[in-house]
Design a protein with these regions (language model features):
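A short, charged/proline- and glycine-enriched loop
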Residues: 2-15, 78-79, 194-203
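N-terminal subdomain of nucleotide-sugar transferases
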Residues: 1-51, 223-233
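Extended catalytic core of nucleotide-activated donor transferases of GT-like folds
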Residues: 15-17, 31-150, 271-275
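Conserved catalytic-core segment of nucleotide-activated headgroup transferases in glycan assembly
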Residues: 23, 27-30, 148-151, 158-267
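Short, flexible/disordered intra-domain loops and linkers
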Residues: 17-27, 116-123, 248-251, 320-325
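Catalytic binding pocket for nucleotide-activated donors in carbohydrate/polymer assembly enzymes
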Residues: 282-362
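Donor nucleotide-activated moiety binding/catalytic core segment of transferases
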Residues: 244-306
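C-terminal alpha-helical cap of glycosyltransferases
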Residues: 359-382
Length: 382
């Protein structure tokens, strides 16, 4: 690795309110986890979050601002060696200012922007004019958006992209679950069926349902087929979050789900938005998930870290939970049935296995820290 010194690093965020929840989306969490990783570097980097909006920075921010200080762009623009543009975009004028003083500018791409952009175009979702910044020193792209968006980024920004490791940490999850029963961790619940000896399970589907990448329909079909096999003795209820608008206003969605047995028998509810930790703790035993082109997600780790059975098709973390390939619903059904019948036999061992598998993604992982220092060295000492 090229020799690298301690750096003054800024990571952008784009606050929309003074007390904005970190559960609104994953962007704020991403910035915090990346900041924690750089703070753990043996080189002793100085790291701060840089807000790119006009929202005031107050004590209402939902994280430890002493550990992860947040500053306005204008207050730190002369005090940075590197600015990583992650959760808020800087302007053309701000870019020129940083470049003139020698600050390195890195685009950290953690969203499927190609898909989001074409959906905005096709479905006329208003996002406003797009500023295509072509002055970056590096473009870093996390693995799950490489397939859909890497060439989109590189062509428009006129620079090759670099795939970088995904980073996560349980700190936000643990802060949210501190006062929950068992600190939000899974425990077998309910009374065992005297005929089968098994406890009936509460299923949950928690996809955002805002685009084609993470949608609830395939998980619904998995739950339906399992319900036809096991019935109400094994599946007490299915909650589908972020879906109340579909159940009320989408004729296509309504026409598909109204004839499902699990819906007809009153065993399914289509509800609004909930934060993950509380909903898992209060309403869930098993989570069913499906993604299409976004095969790593914080949600996957939050579910598995706390020991909940997780039925999913995310091939970039296939070692987690109960995996099925692609759109193979039959395998998904078999995995769900296995979890219903056997997950509680070794729920503690399962949780330990999940946490061991997630270690390679943690912000405190020494190998991961070293990889990011090498990435910084390539940018700062080309």
């Amino acid at each position: 690795m090229t020799k690298l010194r301690a750096l003054r690093i800024g990571i952008t965020i784009g606050l929309r309110s003074e007390s904005e929840s970190i559960w609104v989306n994953g962007i704020k969490q991403n910035a915090l986890y990346l900041a924690k990783l750089f703070q753990h570097s043996p080189l002793g980097h100085s790291v701060m979050l840089v807000n790119t909006t006009t929202v005031a920075l107050t004590d209402a921010l939902p994280w430890d601002t002493k550990r992860f200080p947040a500053r306005r762009f204008d207050d730190v623009k002369d005090a940075l060696d590197v600015l990583i543009e992650l959760g808020g975009q800087i302007s053309d004028e701000q870019t020129r200012y940083l470049k003139a003083r020698g600050t390195k500018l890195i685009s950290y791409c953690c969203g499927p922007e190609y898909v989001q952009m074409i959906e905005a175009m096709i479905f006329r979702r208003v996002s406003g004019p797009v500023f295509i910044n072509q002055q970056y020193d590096a473009i870093w792209v996390i693995p799950q958006v490489m397939e859909t968006s890497a060439h989109f980024f590189s062509t428009l920004r006129r620079l090759p992209v670099r795939e970088v490791p995904f980073v996560w940490d349980p700190m936000c999850l643990q802060a949210s679950t501190r006062r929950l029963p068992f600190e939000g961790e899974y425990r077998p619940g309910g009374y065992a069926n005297p005929r089968t000896g098994r406890r009936p399970k509460r299923l949950a589907v928690m996809e955002p349902n805002i685009d084609v990448l993470k949608f609830c329909l395939y998980p619904l079909l998995i739950a339906e087929q399992a319900f036809r096999i096991e019935g109400g003795d094994a599946i007490v209820h299915l909650h589908v979050t972020n879906a109340d608008h579909l159940a009320r206003h989408s004729p296509e969605f309504i026409s598909i789900v109204k004839d499902l047995d699990i819906v007809r028998m009153g065993k399914a509810s289509f509800v609004g938005r909930y934060d993950t930790p509380h909903f898992l703790s209060e309403h869930t035993d098993i989570v069913i998930s499906h993604q299409w082109g976004l095969a790593l997600n914080y949600f996957h780790f939050e579910v598995c870290w706390n020991g909940f059975a997780f039925i999913h098709n995310a091939h970039l973390c296939r070692e987690l939970g109960y995996f099925y390939e692609g759109n193979d619903i039959e395998t998904g059904v078999r995995q769900l049935l296995h979890a219903i019948r056997h997950h509680d036999n070794d729920w503690q061992g399962y949780r330990a296995k999940q946490r061991k598998a997630i270690l390679r993604f943690l912000a405190s992982n020494l190998g991961l820290i070293s990889q990011y220092d090498e990435l910084l060295a390539d940018v700062c000492n080309p």
